[in-house]
A protein has these predicted regions:
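Iron-sulfur (Fe-S) cluster-binding segments and ferredoxin-like electron-carrier domains
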Residues: 189-199
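C-terminal accessory extensions appended to soluble enzyme cores
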Residues: 1-28, 382-475
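Short helix/loop capping segments that flank catalytic or ligand/cofactor-binding pockets
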Residues: 184-186, 195, 437-439
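Short cysteine/histidine-rich metal-coordination sites, predominantly Zn2+-binding motifs
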Residues: 200-208
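Conserved AdoMet/S-adenosylmethionine-binding subsite of the radical SAM
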Residues: 210-224, 228, 234-393
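Flexible, acidic/Gly-rich N-terminal and inter-domain linker regions that tether
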Residues: 1-166
């Protein structure tokens, strides 16, 4: 084995030379990598008193969920009072116009989220960019895709009973309410969630809440093929803990239910809610009940940028994990101007893992709702990002970028069946029928389209759409 021995001797000589001739502080081999760990942002709670509107707020007030809700920003006047002269006049003007002409969600931002914005660059701040969109943020020619829809995933079409979407064979989505402690500009349920805005008169549940919950429970009991329930809305953080505990507790008792996921952005946007004694007590009772019934009970949160994560969020997460929840996972949304770089996705994923003990899980491509084109990425851009983040995180914590294809469901972005890059149309297939296709013989043979933002297409593709040429709805 002389060749191997010679190679080993050479490696030892190089190691000795490095240790004797080069100071260790100058050896930085990892800095040649496209991404360098750890993230450069300090994990701290920003001082809210730096903002003019919060200058006199005490720590006790800041930690109060009631105070946070009462002082959430609901309009431009309140936003200006928080930031004072720090918010540029042209940004105020642009947000005002957007609220009148483009916004699909009303403004609602808790102080906790406002405090994570960069007050020295509000135009460029990623959290402001998706929570409080400005007219100038939107694409001037294509604010909406021609195929955008209010309920782009057709969730209401798949309601087995009001508020219960049965899209996958073994999984359902229970929309318990239509409000949140914060309203995201890109909300995929903009058709149902939140207050009316000039552009959108929201649909409303017709059944009383109690009757709706009873109908959902009855359906789950009568449908043994369902084993997995996502409890969402809206946001469960807006449901009184007694109501949440009653509903989820009853779902836990159903024999065929093995997995329950509680979905909330509030754990990031309003962690104070989950640090209240009554909420913690109710959540602990649910965790213990789930364990006793051999049901996996997990929490899914929605964080899009590392700046949103603070020690207060980590405290709330760790308290919940200590109670016996199966896991707390993050499902972010991939958005241009927010997290559309490998660095942004990796910074967020590492901060989730290292500081909050939240598992990076999914990044969804932004759905094709009206006036969302400036946030959306093309499928090939998402594929490139997925490639770029591989190899840095543990395999079990590497988030998957997925496309939620209408009438199909989640698909990893590399699962596309065919892709016309020139026209920006990708085609996808599926191996199951949704709740509205049980008698459709062609459902498993059909190819389902998804559309790239038109401004990402080559000139010829853009001209195709400008000319109004018909794009096939189904291939």
């Amino acid at each position: 084995m002389p060749e191997v021995a010679g190679r080993n001797d050479l490696l030892r000589r190089r190691a000795r030379a490095s240790s004797t001739e080069t100071p260790s502080s100058e050896i930085r081999p990892l800095e040649t990598q496209p991404y360098v760990y750890p993230p450069r942002r300090d994990f701290v709670e920003p001082d809210w008193r730096r903002l003019p509107g919060f200058r006199d707020v005490t720590e006790a007030e800041w930690l109060s969920a009631k105070w946070q809700r009462l002082h959430s920003v609901k309009n431009l006047d309140q936003l200006q009072k928080v930031f004072g002269d720090l918010i540029p006049a042209d940004l105020v003007e642009s947000i005002t116009r957007d609220q009148l002409e483009r916004a699909t969600m009303s403004m609602l931002v808790p102080p906790q989220m406002l405090n994570t914005m960069n007050e020295t660059d509000l135009w460029g701040d990623p959290i402001r960019h998706y929570m409080i969109p400005a007219f100038a943020d939107r694409h001037p020619e294509w604010p909406s895709h021609p195929h955008s829809e209010r309920d782009s995933l057709h969730e209401a079409d798949m309601w087995a009973v009001e508020g219960l979407t049965h899209r996958y064979p073994t999984k359902v989505l229970a929309e318990l309410l239509a409000t949140c402690p914060q309203y995201c500009g890109h909300c995929t349920r903009m058709d149902l969630v939140g207050n009316n805005v000039p552009q959108v008169i929201k649909h409303r549940f017709e059944l009383k809440q109690k009757d709706r919950y009873e109908a959902i429970i009855d359906y789950l009991k009568a449908t043994p093929s369902v084993r997995d329930v996502v409890v969402s809305g809206g946001d469960m953080a807006n449901l009184p803990i007694a109501h949440l505990e009653d509903f989820v507790g009853r779902v836990i008792e159903i024999d065929n239910i093995r997995d329950i996921r509680l979905a909330t952005k509030g754990l990031m946007g309003l962690p104070q809610h989950f640090l209240q004694d009554d909420v913690l007590a109710g959540m602990e009772r649910l965790a213990k009940k789930a364990l006793a019934h051999d049901v996996d009970l997990a929490i899914h949160i929605h964080v899009n940028h590392a700046n949103s994560l603070t020690p207060l969020v980590a405290t709330a997460v760790k308290k919940l994990l200590s109670m016996g929840f199966r896991d707390i996972r993050n499902q972010g949304v991939l958005m241009r101007g927010v997290n559309d770089t490998p660095e942004a996705l990796l910074d967020l994923s590492f901060t989730l893992l290292d500081h909050t003990k939240v598992m990076p899980y999914y990044f969804y491509m932004c759905d094709m709702i009206p006036n969302a084109e400036h946030w959306r990425l093309a499928v090939h851009e998402a594929q490139d990002l997925q490639h770029s983040i591989m190899g840095y995180l543990p395999g079990f914590a590497t988030p998957r970028i997925v496309c939620d294809v209408p009438f199909v469901g989640k698909r990893w972005v590399h699962q596309v069946e065919s892709y016309d890059r020139a026209l920006g149309i990708s085609y996808w297939t599926k191996n199951y029928r949704t709740g509205i296709e049980h008698d459709d013989p062609d459902a498993l043979e059909r190819r389902y389209p998804y559309y790239d933002p038109i401004y990402t297409l080559p000139p010829g593709g853009q001209e195709h759409w400008r000319a109004g040429l018909p794009a096939s709805a189904h291939a």
